[in-house]
Amino acid sequence: MTRGPEADTELRVAASRDALVSASIIEEVAAWGASHGFPSWVPGSFTGLDSVGMSRLRGDIAAGGLHLVWRGDRPVATFSLLERDPIFWPFAGDDALYLHRFAVRRLAAGAGRHAVEWCLREASSRGRSFVRLDCLADNPGIRRYYERYGFTAVDEFVIDGTRYCLCEVRVSA
């Protein structure tokens, strides 16, 4: 449990019961993005206990990597910080942590900043040199968001017609 800059903001490692909470935040962000022309996840991809999205969240929980950001008694953001990313970074070494499934409810200004800054500190405290992530290459808003924290694009590629951007930020020398 980590307190944020706002007195009532708290970051917690998710438990198995939190998969549905995380999924609901991601689905809310996906629906908003789809309705405003900012693609992220496909709406519905985290709906249902047997969905691919839920399977990934359960795997993240098992790895101890899924987190929720709370404001008071309300979950307002979710993300996974993982040791490896064999899909998007298969040849990367052990010098990074990987940020995935980062979603912040629209009403939760500042919660995303708290989460990203915590990820950067956490990677540094574990002796990692980088935090890495993938995002949709065709979403300039999310790319600008990550650039504010020092992330830079290191590669782009296409999977099933979707363009992805790989980004990283150095957290220690």
Where are these regions (language model features)?
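Conserved N-terminal entry element of GNAT/NAT acetyltransferase domains
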Residues: 1-20, 24, 173
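Conserved GNAT-fold acetyl-CoA-binding loop/helix
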Residues: 27-56
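A short helix-loop-beta-strand connector motif used in the catalytic cores of GNAT acetyltransferases and
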Residues: 51-68, 98
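Conserved beta-strand in the GNAT
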Residues: 68, 74-83, 98, 103
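Conserved acetyl-CoA binding element of GNAT-fold acetyltransferases
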Residues: 90-106
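Conserved beta-strand-loop-alpha-helix junction that forms the acyl-donor binding cleft
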Residues: 107, 133-143, 159-163
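Conserved acetyl-CoA-binding loop-helix of GNAT-fold acetyltransferases
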Residues: 109-121, 144-148
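Conserved GNAT acetyl-CoA-binding A-motif
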Residues: 123-135
